[in-house]
Amino acid sequence: MSELRISRLGFGLSGIAGSGNFIHQQRLVRTAIDAGITHFDVAPFYGSGDAEKILGDILRDCPEQVTVTTKFGLLPAKVPGKLRAIVRPVLRRVKGLKQLAVKLINYSHRPDIQCFKPGDLLASAEASMRKLQRPANIFLLHDMVRVHSESEAVVGELHQLKKTGYAALTGISGSEADLRELCLAHPAVYSVTQLENSLSNPADLGFFKSSGISSITHRAIMGGFEHLNFLFRFRPGFGQIWEREIGLDVSNQDVLMQVILELALFENQAGTVLFSSTRPERIKIAAAAVQKPLLTEVQCEGIRRLFQDVYQHPPDRRH
C-alpha cells in the first residue's frame, strides 16, 4: 500500500468483546503493539457492536503510531446488547441451559445486512470515527450486496469519504470473483481488497497486485489449521511426504500456527495478513512469523504444492 505503511500482520478484533474484561482486552492490543503488530481491523458488526469503541478507548492513550481498518455494510443483530452478560452467570449455575445459551449467543452474532440509503455510508463513517476517536486509515465496504457495491451513490460517498478526511484509503471486502470486477470498474475507490487466502481457499493475489490493488488477507488459520491436522492424523502418507520435502516438525500446534501464517505472508508479500486471538501468548507466537520465520521461500512453495496435490476432500468431522 504505497500511500500508507501498515504492519505485515494485522490484529482482527471481531471477537474482542467476548475476550474478557477491558483490562484483558487492553492487554491483547498492548501485546500486539509491543510485538510490532500495529494494524487493527474492526467493523460496526464486530463484538456485537462494541469493537470500535473498545479499540478507541484502548488506543486513546497509545503513544505508538497505529493504523485502523473499519467497514460499512454489516450490523450486529438487533438483540439486547447485554445478552452475553446476562447469559454467562446463568450458564455457570445451570449447566442444562448451556445449549440454549449458546444458541442465543450465536444468534446475537448473526449480521443484519444493511440496506443502503443515500447518506448511510457517510453517517456510518462519522459514527465509527467517534467510537474510534480517530479517522480510519482504511474504510471498506463489508460484504455488501453487489447491487449496492457498484451503485453510483455508494461510489460517490466513498469519494466523498476520502475528500472529507474520514479515511486515507477505501476499498471492499468480499468474494474474490466480485472483488475482481468491482476493483477494475472503480479503481479509484476500491484500491484495497480484503479477502480470504488460505490453504483450503487460495486467492489469486497476483491479479490484484498487477492491477495496482492492495490486498489484506484473512482466515489463513481458520482455512488451514484444521485441514492440516486432519491430513497429519488420518493420511500417514501426507506426513511422510511433509517430512521428506518440508522437513519441519509441526507436532507442536503453536509451530503449526506460525507456519500457516508464514505461508500467508509469503503469498501476500505486498500486503497484510489478519489474524485474531484472545490469548496474549498466541499473539507473540504470531509475531514470530515476521520476526523469526521458520520457513524458506522454497518450503512455502512446497507446502502449497503438497497440500494441493494430496488434499482432495474437506475434513470429515465424524472421526
Set out the residue ranges of the language-model regions.
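Short, flexible segments with low predicted structural confidence
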Residues: L4, R27, Q99-A101, P111, ...
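Alpha-helical membrane-targeting segments
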Residues: L75-P111
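Beta/alpha (TIM)-barrel catalytic core signal, keyed to glycine-rich beta->alpha loops juxtaposed to Asp/Glu
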Residues: I23, R30, P44-S48, A125-N137, ...
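Active-site mouth loops of central-metabolism enzymes
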Residues: G12-I23, Y107-L122, G247-S251
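N-terminal binding-site loop/beta-alpha segment at the start of enzyme catalytic domains
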Residues: M1-P89, K163
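A short alpha-helix capping/helix-coil boundary motif
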Residues: R5-L9, A35, L104-I105, P135-I138, ...
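Short, charged beta->alpha transition segments
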Residues: G96-K98, G119-K131
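Non-cysteine beta-strand/loop elements that form the S-adenosyl-L-methionine
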Residues: T67-K71, R93-V102, S214-I221
